């Protein structure tokens, strides 16, 4: 893939100030406007976004992350397309960036089995291709995850994490102070998960929770060997600390960024979307895109979380 370098230039105005980062009605935002994994790349410069298993890992609208990436590329003059990868497909290793969404227990098990049997995503990760994983997608990428019935499933081993149930489900607005270089603004999303994800030594947190729960605390810490990793680096708080300021959110390891934030998270956080695009394009920066509706959405969601 040879990317166009649009890292220099003035602010790009979105057509009509489209709301939610291009997720409004229109041909460019249609979730049906995708291509099959075995289709040919239209040109060498076309950016291919791999939408991984939306048939089972698309419960919470996380498919929208691929739409955001495509639209932000198109606004900057790049040709981009979404490659829809289902359970009926071999997973290609040729996409320039991948997104994986959330799902329930049965869907997670199907996803883990298929991605293990068809390891194109693993090959892409080994080459440093950027991947965004949401909620259950994050759990599948780990060493193992426990379902609500207590059964343990093996993950892909791409992230040094384990996931087991919390005492109660985490539902609500989530605001996170990012700890990843390149992110300077608070991250906002909506969490809806039963799992508590614990980081091992090779994984780092995406950020520190300001409002909400984040990665959570296992109901049975003894089932998770690294339970102390539920606190942010430098905190003295114990695993079960009540202060949300001591909690961490998400996982960063290699080229993978994972989070419990739905929304879709990239629609709410354009800086996050552009960080992923810079990695996919191999550039240091991109010209800003002015979407006033997104800034309004961010203000509203962050204010809601603080109430």
Regions inferred by a protein language model and the residue ranges of each:
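Conserved beta-strand scaffold positions in the cores of enzyme catalytic domains, especially
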Residues: 51, 82-84, 158, 189-191, ...
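Cysteine-nucleophile active-site neighborhood
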Residues: 105-180, 184
